[in-house]
Amino acid sequence: MIERIWTGHRSVVIGVSGIALVAIAAAGLLVVVQPGGTGQAGATPSATPGATESAITSPLLPNLLTPVPSPSETPAASATPGPDWVYSDLDGALAPPDLAHRLPMAIMVDDNAAARPQSGFSSASIVYQAPAAGGEDRYVMVFQEGTATDIGPVRSARPYFVYWAAEYKALYGHFGGDVKALQQVIPANLNNIYNMDDLKGGSCPYHRISTRAMPHNAYTNSAALITCVKKMGYPATYQNLPVRAFKDDAPLSQRPATQSIWVPYRTGLISYIFDQATDSYLRLVGGHYQTDPANGQQVKARNVIVLFQSVTTDSVTEPGHNRPVVANVGTGKAIVFLEGQAIVGTWKKASNTALTRLYDSSGAEIPLVRGEIFIQSVPIGTAVTYKAG
């Protein structure tokens, strides 16, 4: 059997004991498929439900296919929709009208080892993870219809996270930030975000806990944020937010048994396992199922999106800090995982405040499944691995 590794520019013929490895290095994509699957030049990996693949031992995939114990927590059942419920702007889920159009709140959250486990994941509509300073990553959790009793630890702003918050005209909650974010980006985008910086007089929603050391102990919650929105005169709701295309769940019979995804970061491996019954992906951090300490729920996503984006270093704005800068305005490669399938396509963000849109290989916008959206921004060249069940 002949196998090929695709680098995005050329193919190399190799032999790996009957297992075909398909790689697109330029897009940062590595897919493991059975012989007889997609392997022709220019083709994209198969997304056929029910496709099977083998666990293998390979230098390219060290320990990535080891089974993980089942989670101790199961996803909580959704509330029964009322007759007046409508679709939420951010994730397309059904919610009461006052929540479905509530002012989005984008909160910067720490990913230092001392900050884990973080709170708020299970209540967020959209979660972004991207490289930040010091070789660490950082999150911005965007809330709309969900209510969180704890969110945090809250950390500082970065310009590219501001651009993501600006997509939703969101309140942007953070503890300070780098010079470019505070002096250049945020003032220029005040028409598209509402700034709530603890270090600049906006401290009403934040508190520190005694069980963690600074700077990993600042928290907020939905109730405190809503109180501050009223106090600062910000609008409680929006009616005309830009929205993505959404679709309803596929029938159970059309969903594959499972799918596994691995997204490596410098701070650890993020992985997802598709759950056929709930049509969602259970999230793991460092090989362990992630539970939200705010409510004990297993963290899950209905959609997992990987954005391959250029990461450079800014050594000019703040000499000596050498902060990473993620180029999230423009266009690039993307993989959209939903309902146990993988769609290889393109992301496009036309401006600092424009919504990031996702397109398939034919140029059509990709409709997402209604519910939580987790967006993993990784440097171009990152090997993102996935396996069908």
Question: Over which residues does each language-model region extend?
Answer:
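A surface/extracellular/periplasmic glyco- and lipid-processing/surface-interacting theme
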Residues: I2, S11, G50-I56, L65-P71, ...
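N-terminal Sec-pathway targeting helices
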Residues: I5-I19
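Intrinsically disordered, low-complexity segments enriched in small/polar and acidic residues
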Residues: A41-A47, S54-T57
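A general structural signal for well-ordered secondary-structure junctions
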Residues: V22, G36-G39, N191-N192
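Hydrophobic single-pass membrane-insertion segments
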Residues: A27-G42
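Hydrophobic membrane-insertion alpha-helices, especially the h-region
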Residues: V16-G28
